Swiss-Prot record:
Signal peptide annotation: none
Name of the encoding gene: CAD1-A
Function text: Responsible for the cyclization of trans,trans-farnesyl diphosphate (FPP) to (+)-delta cadinene.
Substrates-to-products reaction catalysed: (2E,6E)-farnesyl diphosphate = (1S,8aR)-delta-cadinene + diphosphate
Listed GO MF terms: (+)-delta-cadinene synthase activity; magnesium ion binding
Known EC number: 4.2.3.13
UniProt key word Magnesium: yes
Organism field: Gossypium arboreum
Pathway: Secondary metabolite biosynthesis; terpenoid biosynthesis
Official protein name in the record: (+)-delta-cadinene synthase isozyme A
Taxon lineage: Eukaryota, Viridiplantae, Streptophyta, Embryophyta, Tracheophyta
Length: 555
């Protein structure tokens, strides 16, 4: 059996015929072997000592007593935006708890900047602070006061705070329209570094941005602010570079695994996007303690991409039936019923999950992999239904298409698999909760699915024979493409409100669990706003990979 499989896998293009197959034209991978070589990850003793001393200084400053708790807000905000808050989670939580308790006492005389900053920071940490605090910035007619238009810093904070809104907070819906218009008008008149802050915010809000990308950007802005704290800035720069070294080491290991699989030669119809996949998973969790989870989840997303392309871009429907059956049975013996080229991806898929089980066995956590397998099986079952529609030339209703398209986004699978490589915070109850289609996972899935649908239709990224959610909606409801985009965007915005709502205390699950769905939604906002930035690697992916994985920060 093993020798037979080896002979099959050794063939470069086993039994691949182009007759009656779907056609896809993916551009080749753009990174080559750039990340194969692992950089030196050792740091000298002097830098390590400085790093620990600076960390202690920052911790002390977070906890330092002040007369007015609002004075702490800008420093806590800087710690978060510079990307180092993961070192001080308990200290920040304690300080914000105190600020939340003092909110009513300190609210009367606060300006727009302080009110909005406090609102955003507390909401980011799940405190259910009321948006009524913004009513005092409205005039008798119910509009935001004209005097606010000259307070650019305050407008910027109100703009960012508005992205924390939940359902029913009309004042924040109004605030985002008001601040977007006013900041856009003010932008040409601003000077550095405020101009950079406003310009970037209008393109990417804090709430929906990828934390590492945003940290890299904010470091360059923060160092030019007159009010910057030198110790905090230096600590953030060293921390960024240390994390970059860790991430490069992980990516080097993954790229060697990918190169050994040789899919670019053996399965030339599939996308070569392992670096982009790692960048995606860095967005899900970047912290050092999730190193194992990152490596496992990157391999899973890489295999999911290959499987997706098999269903969507190469295999015939008759081949997909036994392929789906083999994945459902999850048994290497099922390889015998598959075409030779499918054996390659099937064996690799099973190997990835077997490796996960081996890595988790010592911790007694291998049970988690069973949940991940079930999630992958549900994904391919949804892929098969979509392939069946195409094969039968069946045009589903929008509701039929949507109900199957949510699973085919892969986001429920990724959310569940992300839990596998996390620590003690994950229990069997976590997976049972995830399997119940909780609001936050469903919301992040809708964001993924609908942003993908808009991107594919708007930028002509789908093949003519493919079903399209936008086309289904246009045909069923007799609307234009733009009207369909608008409707989909309403669902996306509503889903972001659901995500925000699920973070308000008390929560169903611990924050680290909820953060996986939040971060999955953030990846979509960054990579898919201007098209499918994964398949057709665009500016966001290239820029993010370059800034996070290639260019260190000059210290």
């Amino acid at each position: 059996m093993a020798s037979q499989a080896s002979q099959v896998l050794a063939s470069p293009h086993p039994a691949i015929s182009s007759e009656n197959r779907p056609k896809a034209d993916f551009h080749p991978g753009i990174w080559g072997d750039m990340f194969i070589i692992c950089p030196d990850t050792d740091i000298d003793a002097a830098t390590e000592l400085q790093y620990e001393e600076l960390k202690a200084q920052v911790r002390k400053m977070i906890m330092e007593p002040v007369d007015d708790s609002n004075q702490k807000l800008p420093f806590i905000d800087a710690v978060q935006r510079l990307g180092v808050s993961y070192h001080f989670e308990k200290e920040i939580e304690d300080e914000l708890e105190n600020i939340y308790r003092d909110t009513n006492n300190n609210d009367a005389d606060t300006d727009l900047y302080t009110t909005a900053l406090r609102f955003r920071l507390l909401r980011e940490h799940g405190f259910d602070i009321s948006c009524d605090a913004f009513n005092k910035f409205k005039d008798e007619a119910g509009n935001f006061k004209a005097s606010l238009t000259s307070d650019v810093q305050g407008l910027l904070e109100l703009y960012e705070a508005s992205y924390m809104r939940v359902h029913g907070e009309d004042i924040l819906d109004e605030a985002i329209s008001f601040t977007t218009a006013q900041l856009t008008l003010a932008l040409p008149t601003l000077h550095h570094p405020l101009s950079e802050q406003v310009g970037h915010a209008l393109k990417q809000s804090i709430r929906r941005g990828l934390p590492r990308v945003e940290a890299r950007n904010f470091i360059s802005i923060y160092q030019d602010l007159e009010s910057h704290n030198k110790s905090l800035l230096q600590f953030a720069k060293i921390d960024f570079n240390l994390l970059q070294l860790l991430h490069r080491k992980e990516l080097s290991e993954i790229c060697r695994w990918w190169k050994d699989l040789d899919f670019t030669r053996k399965l030339p119809f599939a996308r070569d996007r392992v670096v982009e996949g790692y960048f995606w998973i860095m967005g899900v969790y970047f912290e050092p303690q999730y190193s194992l989870g990152r490596k496992m989840l990157t391999k899973v997303i890489a295999m999911a991409s290959i499987v997706d392309d098999t269903y969507d871009s190469y295999a015939t429907y008759d081949e997909l039936i036994p392929y789906t059956n083999a994945i459902e049975r999850w048994d290497i013996k099922c390889m015998n019923q598959l075409p030779n080229y499918m054996k390659i991806s099937y064996k690799a898929l099973l190997n990835v999950y077997e490796e996960m089980e081996q890595l988790l066995a010592n911790q007694g956590r291998q049970y988690r992999v069973e949940y991940a397998k079930k999630a992958m099986i549900r994904l391919v079952q949804a892929y098969l239904l979509e392939a069946k529609w195409t094969h039968q030339n069946y045009k589903p209703t929008f509701e039929e298409f949507r109900d199957n398209a949510l699973p085919t986004s892969g986001y429920a699978m990724l959310a569940i698999t992300a839990f596998v490589g996390m620590g003690e915070v994950i229990t069997p109850e976590t997976f049972k909760w995830a399997a119940s289609d909780p609001k936050i996972i469903k919301a992040s899935t809708i964001i993924c699915r609908f942003m993908d649908d808009i991107a594919e239709h708007k930028f002509n990224h789908r093949r003519e024979d493919d079903c399209s959610a936008i086309e289904c909606y246009m045909k069923q409801y007799g609307v234009t493409a733009q009207e369909a985009y608008n409707e989909f965007n309403k669902h996306i915005e509503s889903s972001w409100k659901d995500v925000n709502e699920e973070f308000l205390k008390p929560t169903e699950m611990p924050t680290p669990v909820l953060c996986r769905s939040l971060n999955l939604a953030r990846v979509m906002d960054v990579l898919y706003r201007e098209g499918d930035g994964y398949t057709h690697v665009g500016k966001a992916a290239k820029g993010g990979i370059t800034s996070l994985l290639i260019d260190p920060i000059q210290i």
